[in-house]
Amino acid sequence: MKKLRYLYTDGDHKWAVVARDPERPPFVIDTNEYLIVKGDDAILTDPGGLEIFPVVFTAVSQEFNPEQINKIFSSHQDPDIISSLGLWLEVNPDIRCHLSWLWRTFVPHFGGTRDTFVSIPDEGVRIPLGDIELEAIPAHYLHSCGNFNLWDPKAKILFSGDIGA
């Protein structure tokens, strides 16, 4: 079973990882999801595929109210990264999904409407989170075209998705 573990805490600014699941079925790719919180603002990075949604949701729910997640960051378009989007939108229909402009017509097949998606230009963008800004940094072709990393300059943590996978 996946568990949520805090990696960084500074007041109301937190980073947590939903770590690998040693009990997962061998035919399912395992991923690590990260929850970044600043005040009342929360972003979930690469929330995973449909197959692992129940264990990710359970792990997050044990430490955090998942209805407070109002942003998702998708490093790229692969189903193991973002196909659970539709299920997260059932938890909070107001979630905004930040992803490369390149995938704005592909990822909606997993759920959402035009208003769900916030396109990231090739050069990257700053994403507000509470009173700080995270930086979507281009990492094109390090795993996929339109791939992005996410940098938190306050915590000095870089989310690199599944580069090298």
Report residues per predicted region.
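Conserved beta-strand hairpin/beta-sheet module of binuclear metal-dependent hydrolase folds
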Residues: 3-60, 149-160
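Short, structured coil segments at secondary-structure junctions
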Residues: 11, 91-93, 113-114
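Amphipathic alpha-helical blocks and their helix-capping loop/short-beta junctions
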Residues: 164-165
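Structured beta->alpha junctions
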Residues: 48-49, 77, 140
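Metallo-beta-lactamase
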Residues: 5, 98-147
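Active-site metal-binding motif and surrounding structural segment of the metallo-beta-lactamase
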Residues: 52-98
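Short, conserved beta-strand edge motifs with alternating hydrophobic and charged residues
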Residues: 137, 160-161
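Short catalytic-loop micro-motif centered on adjacent basic/acidic residues
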Residues: 43-46, 70-74, 136
